[in-house]
Amino acid sequence: MDELKKLAGVTAAKYVKNGMIVGLGTGSTAYFFVEEIGRRVKEEGLQVVGVTTSNRTTEQARGLGIPLKSADDIDVIDVTVDGADEVDPDFNGIKGGGGALLMEKIVATPTKEYIWVVDESKLVETLGAFKLPVEVVRYGSERLFRVFKSKGYCPSFRETEGDRFITDMGNYIIDLDLKKIEDPKQLANELDHTVGVVEHGLFNGMVNKVIVAGKNGLDILEK
């Protein structure tokens, strides 16, 4: 599967042209995209500026010699390539399994062409089998946890090595084990209006193209 993920990442990189501002995604498949951009910068003289979606991707891009700018310094991103944890037939998706959902959504929002690279296991009929990440400020997070629990959302604080996971932006993540999300847009609206929620992992209708790596090769889905 790694070879297919690599092929998907390399294929996505073909959408990147000289002079572009490029959003560099986070995750196991997006990793190969960033590697390919780095190779083209070094070997082909590709001239691009990258905007990263996590500290991990920043380190990777710097190591490859990709010039970077902060999201604060740009108004439009030409193309962003990132991964996803689930994608439904309406091009709604869940992201944030790696904990970078806030920065990923900040980079996705001003992007003209937003591309996801995934393996075929990520294609689902209905979102929700993958736990929905919700990034929350630490202050009041226990109360927010109880609110989610009272709604039957089966929340859990994300942990790493026995401690609470802290995002690159210094927040906690509460994962919601919803099993099935019947109305992603309604849930996104609810979470958008919940005080203490910084961002959530529902990316509804944002993506233009999904490059799928499967056992029979690549499939490119477009809106």
UniProtKB/Swiss-Prot annotation:
Q: What reaction does this catalyse?
A: aldehydo-D-ribose 5-phosphate = D-ribulose 5-phosphate
List the taxonomic lineage: Bacteria, Bacillati, Bacillota, Bacilli, Lactobacillales
Cited PANTHER family: RIBOSE-5-PHOSPHATE ISOMERASE 3, CHLOROPLASTIC-RELATED (PTHR43748:SF3)
A single BP term in Gene Ontology: pentose-phosphate shunt, non-oxidative branch
Question: Pathway membership of this protein?
Answer: Carbohydrate degradation; pentose phosphate pathway; D-ribose 5-phosphate from D-ribulose 5-phosphate (non-oxidative stage): step 1/1
Q: What does this protein do?
A: Catalyzes the reversible conversion of ribose-5-phosphate to ribulose 5-phosphate.
Q: Which family does it belong to?
A: Belongs to the ribose 5-phosphate isomerase family.
The record's listing under SUPFAM superfamilies reads: D-ribose-5-phosphate isomerase (RpiA), lid domain, NagB/RpiA/CoA transferase-like
TM helices/strands, residue ranges: none
Q: Which UniProt keywords apply?
A: Isomerase
Q: Where is the active site?
A: E104
Q: How does it assemble?
A: Homodimer.
Q: Which HAMAP family match?
A: Rib_5P_isom_A
Name the record gives this protein: Ribose-5-phosphate isomerase A
Q: What class of enzyme is it?
A: isomerase
The entry lists its GO molecular-function terms as: ribose-5-phosphate isomerase activity
Question: In this record, what's one Pfam family?
Answer: Rib_5-P_isom_A
